[in-house]
Amino acid sequence: MTRAVVIGSGPNGLAGAIALARAGLEVEVHEAEAQLGGGLRSAELTLPGFVHDVCSSVHPLGRASSFFRMLELDVDWLEPDAPAAHPLDDGSAVMLERSLSETAAGLGRDADRYRRLVGPLVDSWSAVERVLLGPYPVPPRALLRLGDRLGTRRLAAALHDSLGAARDFAEREFSDERTRAWFAGHAAHSILPLERRPSAGFGLALIVLGHAVGWPFPQGGSQQLADALAAKLRELGGQIRTSSPVDSLPSADVVLADVVPRELLRLGHGRLPERYARHLRTYRHGPGAFKVDWALDAPIPWRAAKCRRAGTVHLGGSLEEISASEWGAWRGRPVGQPFVLLAQTSLFDPTRAPAGKHTAWGYCHVPNGSAEDMTEGIEAQVERFAPGFRELVLARHAMGPAELEAHNRNLVGGDLNAGAMDLGQLLFRPVRKLVPYRTPLEGVYLCSAATPPGGGVHGMCGYSAARVALKDLERRA
């Protein structure tokens, strides 16, 4: 029987392992940590009974993933009443609603423009998803199908907008400062300066996802998604070995490595050709993250009551403020007043905390590897929009870049995307190669978020790498 070894049990490693097992290969996954899941792990970080997602919580791309849908995973997806909220200093909030029309209604004089920009993309979601989460290079048939749905001119405009900078897009397309700030909050998920390309594309993608599939999370924590993927693999005969670090590339017909480039270099022990190794050494990591988890005595007391309907809240005020925060993180400067992304899943999932209590987390972007403690800055931003928040904190748990990387080696310097996703590294990830998953070593493939389509919980990096491996096996047979 053809044997495959997968290094890493994050969503991409597990997705790749499942794809290989479905094709009849004997699959073994090695996970260095005692708990499987990579960025999908959950734990009681603060107090007993309070379940926190150690890294990722909200998974629009997980719901959108065609591979995850095909697997019919045993996961109970929960949806907040609204995907996201953006509170402002005047006590109001701008909302991303599931309904496009309800969202537009909250954008004032930008409502009609928003409908014209976003409506066609939402209506064409199935075709958009094939381009957004498909393999690299994007199959021509996927672009042709999207062109058929949108029309040639609208497709060209959508591609132009998606590859642009968020600040340029917001100032060109929207006239209301509230709308510009709201869009900037979505675009800042890119971990890019808003003046850098393609930050606009991240903002547009997350907004369209909010309308098309929502911003859901697994009941009981992200670990439930990891466990469901692991159960599917075991059902297919695959094995998972935890507390099983790998120090060199194993001998197998297929090796899928859910690792970042520098880890592949370490595992290769000089076996990789120098030209390829040189490209891997120049792979760039983006800013890191600083995250605080809270056990709370009650829900966060938002001044804007609408924020209580959202699973995710963006805390940054204006476009100018968000831009300054993201530039600071990118340029390696102290962040000062940080843009904070906050998740409050226990409002919609009572399994996350004891009766009447709640959990939440907030994180901000910081310079890669920064040792600065951002707890006070993050909590000040929450208090700014929710006076009395600090009085509700029963316990807190903070993780800076070093702690995040210790938790997951792929988070180099706290970089949540396993590599900067600016235009060059979005299109050529991790190297300029027609098939980026295939390494020069026969049978060895890279399948982490350092390959297309990049960061996020969707499993498509692993699935795409596995498909390449299976095609190569057929050719070698």
Question: Where do the PLM segments sit?
Answer:
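Mid-domain catalytic core of redox enzymes
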Residues: 238, 242-353
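Helical element adjacent to the flavin cofactor pocket in flavoenzyme catalytic cores
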Residues: 203-246
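Extreme N-terminal leader/targeting segments of oxidoreductases
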Residues: 1-5, 22-23, 425-435, 468-477
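A conserved FAD-binding loop/helix module that cradles the flavin
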Residues: 447-470
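Rossmann-like flavin
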Residues: 89-198
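N-terminal glycine-rich phosphate/pyrophosphate-binding loop and immediately adjacent elements
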Residues: 2-133, 420
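Conserved FAD/dinucleotide-binding core of flavoprotein oxidoreductases
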Residues: 105, 262-266, 295, 354-381
